[in-house]
Amino acid sequence: MDLFEYQAKELFAKHGVPTSAGRVTDTVAGAREIAEEIGKPVMVKAQVKVGGRGKAGGVKYSPDVDAAVANAEAILGLDIKGHVVKKLLVAEASDIAEEYYISFLLDRTNRTYLAMCSVEGGVEIEVTAEENPDALAKIPVDAVKGVDLAFARSIAEAGKLPAEVLDAAAVTIQKLWEVFINEDALLVEVNPLVRTPDDQILALDGKVTLDENAAFRQPGHEAFEDRDATDPLELKAKENDLNYVKLDGEVGIIGNGAGLVMSTLDVVAYAGENHGGVKPANFLDIGGGASAAVMAAGLDVILNDAQVKSVFVNVFGGITACDAVANGIVGALKTLGDEANKPLVVRLDGNNVEEGRRILAEANHPLVTVVATMDEAADKAAELAHAAK
């Protein structure tokens, strides 16, 4: 889960990372109030989860309250790379002597953590990495040892920060590591980390990505969810504990087990090449349980996707036998009633498959077609989706 800048700074403050004073608002009047409270020049910053805000006119210096109001009026509602600005961070403007870069992230390739640091901050780090790779230090972090002050200082040294700020930078870097570990983050980035004329170190910007798999032990993170920006279908799936990702195709997919669902996406995409280029509409894994309630929840999500023209239910019976899956499908269709209005192609295999197929045959639902193999089912689902386009 990506956080807005103001949310990242809330976590920074929680762990003692120094930042500029400020508050978030969603109105021009609120921007005026905050600017008046601060009583100094402020920065008015668009709160969107995308880079390049400054170039798009989403970050503006405001020397006085009137300027802050004018800038708030200009930024609210601004479209930045498809993200409409609905919130502003109004923060005290800081005098800047130098700008640095620091981040902690999960290094999946090497199965460890990675710190990155550079004396060249304030610009897109991808540009620095490409044009001057030697300016970006990459330091592996031992997951057991972590980052103490001494190691934090070595990170700052590797990034070639000036000697006179190494100690102050080390303190901030160590606290950023605490944010990374204690908040179960996948990324903590500060760009720029600034040095003020009196040698203070401040995190003027912040980017944090939280690991949603750790939500069970981070109850406070629920408050960071941006429900307005979340796809309503994904929100409905989450409320029903379904693993769902919306795609841009026409064939809805339901399967049990991530591996089977991924394989189903592949065969549907392949079959779609022969049927007008139709593609999978989603990833939906119902897990080990295929009860009527679970199946109804899954179908409810998929059938409410206007792009979906057909549904492919692909289940391998294991602990949950195929007859239970079949009863789940029949029960789900009864529960949904008229909402179930798109053709379903069902492929069952595994434990008690013959009984499962018998149950579906006896139900004789007009929308359900039972197919024996995955390839045939994918082809049929793609054909039906193409015909309905």
Swiss-Prot record:
Residue span, ATP-grasp domain: 9-236
Instruction: Give the note describing cofactor binding and stoichiometry.
Output: Binds 1 Mg(2+) ion per subunit.
For the keyword Nucleotide-binding, the answer is: yes
What pathway, per the record? Carbohydrate metabolism; tricarboxylic acid cycle; succinate from succinyl-CoA (ligase route): step 1/1
Which GO annotations describe the biological process of this protein? succinyl-CoA metabolic process; tricarboxylic acid cycle
Principal EC category: ligase
Pfam families from the UniProt entry: ATP-grasp_2, Ligase_CoA
* Any one cellular-component term (Gene Ontology): cytosol
Binding residues for Mg(2+): N191, D205
Listed binding positions for substrate are N256, G318, I319, T320
E.C. code: 6.2.1.5
Q: Which cofactor does it need?
A: Mg(2+)
For this chain, one GO molecular function annotation is:
succinate-CoA ligase (GDP-forming) activity
HAMAP family reported in the protein's UniProt record: Succ_CoA_beta
Instruction: State the protein's purpose.
Output: Succinyl-CoA synthetase functions in the citric acid cycle (TCA), coupling the hydrolysis of succinyl-CoA to the synthesis of either ATP or GTP and thus represents the only step of substrate-level phosphorylation in the TCA. The beta subunit provides nucleotide specificity of the enzyme and binds the substrate succinate, while the binding sites for coenzyme A and phosphate are found in the alpha subunit.
This chain's protein is named: Succinate--CoA ligase [ADP-forming] subunit beta
Biological classification of the source: Bacteria, Bacillati, Actinomycetota, Actinomycetes, Mycobacteriales
> Gene name on record?
sucC
